[in-house]
């Protein structure tokens, strides 16, 4: 039976009716590449409210949708007979009112569809497609049906009924029957017409709760006649508090399931299914006590603890100043008041260390949420947050959407970090911006912590320094009065002139040589993974490039007997390293630039006694790899961590005394207005990993531009001096934090069509946007082609004190189906 979709609801129609009887609902239907709000009838006896997740018929399928409003009157020109009923409510009241408002705001602010925001915010599995199933209608099936279908023309129908009768439930999926029965469609149509079978759509299923069996001790009576195995089973169960998961009990005794069943028949134990949350498994942590606070830490806590309602706090503390302890003190206060806390970190690699410290203080009240979890673990973490108990969730940017009850505090640690901005998927949201809006809606304080605050956060709090809801708190010294590590700048031009061809300067070589003797550990930071930045022919100059992108391929060394690879870091294309030049067949190929693999190769050659661990996105892809590598390092199984940006983000390893920056210039030479800020933040953060323990630290930065303003600011740990130089340049050009930016980018396989589309969008924006808005471009992106798609863009720039609303519907009408439009509000990069 084909069911036509309900008529499309009228755009702009008011769905927020206040009458008590509201027989229709506007449902945002989950359709691929489309956001459709459709009107459905609410069946008698079914309670539906805004934010419910419902199953609705749409054509010949059943889809998931979100109720966005209920109404007493139909939109004009919408006949009641066309309205189909909602099938069922999958999750009732899933969105709290303030959460619902957050999603609406996010869709509007980031210029995207509400359904896109909902798909991103929900855990996996809540809006999945249903499947069609065929069920035997036993009441209508005549007993002599085999005789009736004995004709050869009825062979398909006979096969269907035979299969259905062999099924315990009397039904199979349409997909399964199609595989088993040739010519299924005609035979099934015949059976449906006779009403011997039914066709139905199984409601969309969320990721299901895990329901293993729990064994509970009911009676421990020695007078019962028991076998030795049964008695031992009861003793094990009693010693474990009277309750154990069945699987655990079978291993602990050990015994078989029949032994447990026999005890249940005697009435000594009960066996029942019980939900077991698939929370991320973490090692046990010893409890810790709060240390003595420094005067600055005490002042910070005294300022934040009394805050009620929305407040924004910028906690600016130098590396090693004890920001995390301030977080812990304030979190303890919030938990004591029955409130929950959300803690966001920029990288998965940071969650193990931070989680361990929180769990040592707060035990099992701490949960984690990030992209490294399985779908089941994500789903169950959401379920745990909905139970209503006060708790702490620690996670990466996606954790901002966890529905914590009675939220009392949001913390963004390392708030300056670019990883808080989503750039690979729509919407291109920034977790800091969303956190600010969520804190406003839920009326709780927001703490932004960093040793190198973003210029936006710094400017906001100082521009509103008389606002009682804005607070600037500073931790200017390290705990226990430990000094910041001295920073030595090495001019690599001088090294080359004096005959040093190594990637390590003589100063760094000396420090590395002393590391083993002093039984200390260190970090080597390089801004690129892989071995070499590009491969070029020394005979003809040919550079090996990606066939899909306008970029060179990076050389990656493969361990063991594997062949060396050339890999694209944009589309992940990989090919075997050729032995001769593809252009002129010359065997003289040269590798240029350095990555983490090349650094470790040089270490092995020059310092064979030093043990190292590579810590980059190539070595941490596997689940749990971040923790495993850091634990290995903390146990003293390596002398050096060699890695990329991950090493700069809040790692607190007391045994590190040396930090070496192999090539600082790779952070500075970008055609982007944020280049200096990012370079200063990265170099300052990685420098701050040294000297956090009892032993003093040292930092060696290798560069070809030692007089660069960023290098000089990092040398003296001078954040205030850096921003005093950087902010006037931003203000002069009206770049953030003084101006606002929106990047519109068109992508497609036909370059001329992409260019033509972005030019038409630019003309439209010039016509419709206020004169105070500046349109820069259109122009090709700095990398014109990625993954075989050409990229053209324009930048909308305007003063931060005005509000600009893009003519989205008009812009979308300009874009043909072959051109994808990406809108990035507040872009962190305009390349």
Curated annotation (Swiss-Prot):
User: What keywords is this UniProt entry annotated with?
Assistant: ATP-binding, DNA replication, DNA-binding, Helicase, Hydrolase, Isomerase, Metal-binding, Nucleotide-binding, Primosome, Zinc
SMART domains in the record = DEXDc, HELICc
List, in alphabetical order, the Gene Ontology terms for molecular function in this entry.
3'-5' DNA helicase activity; ATP binding; ATP hydrolysis activity; DNA binding; zinc ion binding
> Could you provide one GO biological process annotation from this protein's UniProt record?
DNA recombination
Motif DEAH box covers 413-416
The record describes how the cofactor is bound as: Binds 2 zinc ions per subunit.
Q: Name one GO cellular component term.
A: primosome complex
Q: Which InterPro entries match?
A: DEAD/DEAH_box_helicase_dom, Helicase_ATP-bd, Helicase_C-like, P-loop_NTPase, PriA, PriA_3primeBD, PriA_3primeBD_sf, PriA_C
Keyword check for Metal-binding: yes
- Cofactor(s) it depends on: Zn(2+)
The UniProt record lists the keyword Isomerase: yes
Q: Which PANTHER family match?
A: PRIMOSOMAL PROTEIN N
Q: How does it assemble?
A: Component of the replication restart primosome.
Q: What is this protein called?
A: Replication restart protein PriA
Annotated source species: Synechocystis sp. (strain ATCC 27184 / PCC 6803 / Kazusa)
- What is this protein's gene name? priA
């Amino acid at each position: 039976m084909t069911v036509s979709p309900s008529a499309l609801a009228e755009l702009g129609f008011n769905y927020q009716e206040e009458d008590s009887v509201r027989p229709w609902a506007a449902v945002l239907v989950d359709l691929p590449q489309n956001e459709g709000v459709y009107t459905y009838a609410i069946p008698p006896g079914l309670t539906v409210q805004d934010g419910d997740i419902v199953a609705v018929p749409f054509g010949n399928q059943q889809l998931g949708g979100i109720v966005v409003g209920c109404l007493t009157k139909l939109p004009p020109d919408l006949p009641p007979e066309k309205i189909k009923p909602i099938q069922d409510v999958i999750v009732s009241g899933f969105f709290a009112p303030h959460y619902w408002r957050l999603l609406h705001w996010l869709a509007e602010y980031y210029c995207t569809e509400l359904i896109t925001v909902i798909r991103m915010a929900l855990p996996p599995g809540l809006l999945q497609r249903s499947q069609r199933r065929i069920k035997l209608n036993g009441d209508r099936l005549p007993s002599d049906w085999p005789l009736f279908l004995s004709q050869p023309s009825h062979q398909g129908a006979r096969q269907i009924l035979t299969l259905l009768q062999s099924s315990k439930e009397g039904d199979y999926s349409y997909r399964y029957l199609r595989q088993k029965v040739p010519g299924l469609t005609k035979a099934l149509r015949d059976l449906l017409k006779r009403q011997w079978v039914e066709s139905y759509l199984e409601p969309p299923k969320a990721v299901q709760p895990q329901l293993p069996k729990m064994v509970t001790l009911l009676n421990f009576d020695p007078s019962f006649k028991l076998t030795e195995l049964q008695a031992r089973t009861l003793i094990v169960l009693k010693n474990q508090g009277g309750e154990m998961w069945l699987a655990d009990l079978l291993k602990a005794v050990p015994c078989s399931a029949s032994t447990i069943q026999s005890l249940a028949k005697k009435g000594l134990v009960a066996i029942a299914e019980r939900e077991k949350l698939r929370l991320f498994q973490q090692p046990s942590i010893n409890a810790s006590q709060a240390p003595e606070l420094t005067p600055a830490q005490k002042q910070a806590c005294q300022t934040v603890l009394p805050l009620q309602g929305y407040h924004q706090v910028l906690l600016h503390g130098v590396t090693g100043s004890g920001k995390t302890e301030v977080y812990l003190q304030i979190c303890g206060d919030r938990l004591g008041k029955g409130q929950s806390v959300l803690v966001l970190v920029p990288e998965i690699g940071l969650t193990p260390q931070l989680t361990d410290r929180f769990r040592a203080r707060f035990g099992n009240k701490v949960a984690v949420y990030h992209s490294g979890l399985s779908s089941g673990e994500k789903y169950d973490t959401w379920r745990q947050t909905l139970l209503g108990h006060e708790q702490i969730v620690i996670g990466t940017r996606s954790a901002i959407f966890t529905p914590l009850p009675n939220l009392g505090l949001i913390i963004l640690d390392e708030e300056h970090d670019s990883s808080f901005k989503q750039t690979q998927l729509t919407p291109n949201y920034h977790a800091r911006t969303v956190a600010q809006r969520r804190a406003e809606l839920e009326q709780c304080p927001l703490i932004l912590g960093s040793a190198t605050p973003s210029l936006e956060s710094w400017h906001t709090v100082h521009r509103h320094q008389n606002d009682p809801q804005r607070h600037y708190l500073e931790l200017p010294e390290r705990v226990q009065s430990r000094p910041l590590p001295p920073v030595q700048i090495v001019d690599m031009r001088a090294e080359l002139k004096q005959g040093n061809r190594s990637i390590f300067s003589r100063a760094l070589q000396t420090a590395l040589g002393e590391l083993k003797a002093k039984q200390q550990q260190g970090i080597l930071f390089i801004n690129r993974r892989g071995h070499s930045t590009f491969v070029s022919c020394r005979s003809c100059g040919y550079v090996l490039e990606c066939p899909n992108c306008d970029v060179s391929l990076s050389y990656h060394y493969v361990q063991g007997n594997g062949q060396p690879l050339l890999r694209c870091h944009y589309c992940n294309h990989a090919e075997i390293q050729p032995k001769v030049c593809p252009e002129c067949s010359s065997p003289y190929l040269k590798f240029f630039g350095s990555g983490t693999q090349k650094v470790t190769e040089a270490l092995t050659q020059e310092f064979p006694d030093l043990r190292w661990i590579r810590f980059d996105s190539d070595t941490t892809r596997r689940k749990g790899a971040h923790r495993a590598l850091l634990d290995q390092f903390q146990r003293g199984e390596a002398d050096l961590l060699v890695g990329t940006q991950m090493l700069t983000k809040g790692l607190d390893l007391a045994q590190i005394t040396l930090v070496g920056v192999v090539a600082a210039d790779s952070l500075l030479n970008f055609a982007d207005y944020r280049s200096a800020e990012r370079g200063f933040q990265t170099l300052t953060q990685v420098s701050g990993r040294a000297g956090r323990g009892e032993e003093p630290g040292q930092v060696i930065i290798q560069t070809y531009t030692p007089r660069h303003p960023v290098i000089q600011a990092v040398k003296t740990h001078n954040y205030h001096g850096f921003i005093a130089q950087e902010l006037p340049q931003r203000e002069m050009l009206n770049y953030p934090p003084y101006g606002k930016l929106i990047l519109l980018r068109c992508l497609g396989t036909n370059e001329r069509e992409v260019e033509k589309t972005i030019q038409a969008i630019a003309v439209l924006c010039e016509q419709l946007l206020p004169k105070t808005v500046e349109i820069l471009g259109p122009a090709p992106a700095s990398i014109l082609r990625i993954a075989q798609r050409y990229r053209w863009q324009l930048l909308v720039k305007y003063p931060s004190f005005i509000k600009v609303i893009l003519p989205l519907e008009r812009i979308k009408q300009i874009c043909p189906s072959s051109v994808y439009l990406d809108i990035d509000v507040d872009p962190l990069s305009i390349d």
